[in-house]
């Protein structure tokens, strides 16, 4: 599906039966760009993704946030857990969406994607035989297999060690380049490395953060990147409210 407009908007308020979570927020999310929302745990990052995806949130929420994404747009969701079916081999996990929809399986496309993520040689193995980083690459291939309009990422790299995380971040960015991505994270460095647009949650609002002029994926040795990382870290520290 071709997306003709340049952005979609997310605006409104959200409250639980106990407190207000967001108050009159407004954010424009650009198509074909990587947008990141950063914030402390419990600030509603994942809830925003659910609203964007037109998912029903718990009835304990009073929600008047509207996302003006067309209802016909399709979404992929990549979570911090790989969510692979343990009894199904890697190839079948990549084709899971087609299986559930009872569509004709595109085995060649699935194998091609496994080759892109460097896992063609384990296509017929079970997930239990793979490392955490390899499993997340399978999840990446499965996300690409769906070829949806908008990719929503809920802290997808948070369970990985530093070296594995760096490698998969770079691979993910290369494969998702020029796609519409909305990611939530609590990692300032990750946000600066990958994002075209960046917002942080503070005082029930979403505020934009200026990023270095260089384009992602940015070099970790860049002085501008390190300065931005320190700046965002301080923002998060100042907005932190102990539970």
PLM feature spans:
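A short, proline-enriched helix->beta-strand linker immediately N-terminal to the Walker B motif
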Residues: 145-149
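Hydrophobic anchor residue at the start of the ABC signature
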Residues: 140-141
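Conserved ABC nucleotide-binding domain
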Residues: 113-129
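ABC-type ATPase nucleotide-binding domains, specifically the catalytic core motifs of the NBD
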Residues: 57, 88, 92-107, 116
């Amino acid at each position: 599906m071709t997306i003709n407009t340049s952005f979609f908007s997310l605006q409104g308020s959200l409250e639980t039966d106990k407190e207000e979570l967001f108050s009159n927020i407004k954010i424009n999310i650009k198509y074909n760009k990587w947008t990141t929302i950063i914030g402390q745990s419990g600030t509603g990052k994942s809830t925003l993704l659910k609203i964007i995806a037109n998912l029903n949130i718990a009835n304990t929420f009073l929600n008047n946030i509207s996302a003006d994404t067309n209802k016909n747009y399709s979404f992929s969701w990549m979570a911090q857990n790989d969510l692979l079916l343990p009894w199904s081999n890697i190839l079948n996990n990549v084709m899971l969406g087609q299986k559930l929809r009872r569509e004709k399986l595109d085995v060649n496309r699935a194998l091609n994607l496994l080759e892109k993520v460097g896992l063609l040689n384990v296509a017929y193995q079970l997930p239990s035989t793979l490392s955490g980083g390899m499993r997340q690459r399978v999840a990446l291939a499965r996300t690409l297999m769906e070829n949806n309009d908008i990719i929503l990422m809920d802290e997808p790299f948070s369970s990985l060690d530093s070296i594995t995380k760096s490698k998969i971040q770079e691979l993910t960015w290369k494969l998702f380049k020029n796609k519409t991505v909305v990611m939530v994270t609590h990692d300032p460095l990750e946000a600066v490395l990958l994002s075209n647009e960046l917002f942080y949650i503070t005082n029930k609002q979403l505020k934009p953060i200026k990023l270095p002029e260089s384009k992602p994926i940015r070099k970790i040795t860049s002085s501008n990147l390190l300065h931005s990382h320190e700046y965002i870290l301080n923002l998060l520290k100042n907005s932190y409210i102990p539970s």
